Design a protein with these regions (language model features):
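Multi-pass alpha-helical transmembrane bundle typical of ion/small-solute transporters
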Residues: 1-238
Length: 238
């Protein structure tokens, strides 16, 4: 914090040098989030039926998500110089272990026998999961923000406002039951997470404009919303 306040140029340079590890860690965590959603035999609604049916069928293969993510980490690290590839592999493994650690902690807390304690501990597990998810999204935003300003405090304020807005909208959608009204909206969100993970991986060795990163999510959400509206109209007619 002292360096960020006293020497923002140096701090920004250090952050930019760490972009490989940030991309690997955040991309791995987000990819595990997306794959865990799609590779689930309890999932009964498909947006892209052919792809999602095949992914759901893979749920019987134990640890398939981990294998896919490890394969992606190794594949993307092959595009990097040797010293950066080692950093990418280490950070990717750290992101994978972090996700598994949060998942294990959530299962341990949810297995409590005492109902009241289970609610409190389950809330803690969900809180930790959301914090890690939010951090993974923010990693990409921090690097992009240095193109606009070197002031860490302005970056923190901007990311904080964005996170608060997104969480407020999410809570509103849950309370209004919007996800149940729009059949494919959740799918659009997880496809956005999956593509963001791939973009973060790719950013480790090539430049991808921030506008592309933002538009990918917006387009997928809008497409899923459109598909949901079409489905609702067809369902009402029948």
């Amino acid at each position: 914090v002292t360096m960020a306040a006293a020497d923002p140029e140096r701090y920004g340079h250090i952050m930019e040098e760490a972009h490989v590890s940030i991309a690997a860690f955040g991309g791995t965590f987000l990819m595990m989030v997306a794959l865990t959603y799609f590779i689930d035999d309890r999932k009964d609604v498909d947006w892209f039926a052919t792809l999602e049916c095949r992914l759901r069928q893979c749920a019987s293969i134990r640890g398939i998500e981990i294998a896919i993510v490890l394969a992606m980490i190794i594949a993307f690290s092959s595009f990097l110089p040797r010293h950066e590839a080692a950093t990418f592999l280490f950070a990717g493994a750290a992101g994978l272990l972090t996700f598994l650690g949060v998942e294990i902690l959530g299962h341990v807390l949810d297995s409590s026998r005492d109902a009241r304690r289970m609610v409190r501990q389950g809330g803690l597990g969900a809180f930790l999961y959301l914090e890690m998810l939010d951090a993974s999204f923010s990693f990409d935003g921090v690097i992009g923000a240095f193109a606009l300003t070197r002031n860490l405090f302005l970056i923190a304020i901007g990311l904080g406002i964005g996170a608060m807005y997104v969480r407020s909208v999410t809570i509103m959608l849950v309370e209004m039951g919007t996800l149940s009204k729009f059949r494919y909206l959740e799918h659009g969100a997880f496809y956005s997470i999956l593509l963001l993970a791939l973009i973060m991986y790719a950013q480790s060795f090539m430049h991808i404009p921030e506008v592309v990163t933002g538009l990918v999510g917006v387009v997928l959400i809008l497409l899923s919303l459109r598909s949901s509206l079409v489905h609702n109209r067809l369902h009402q007619r029948s």
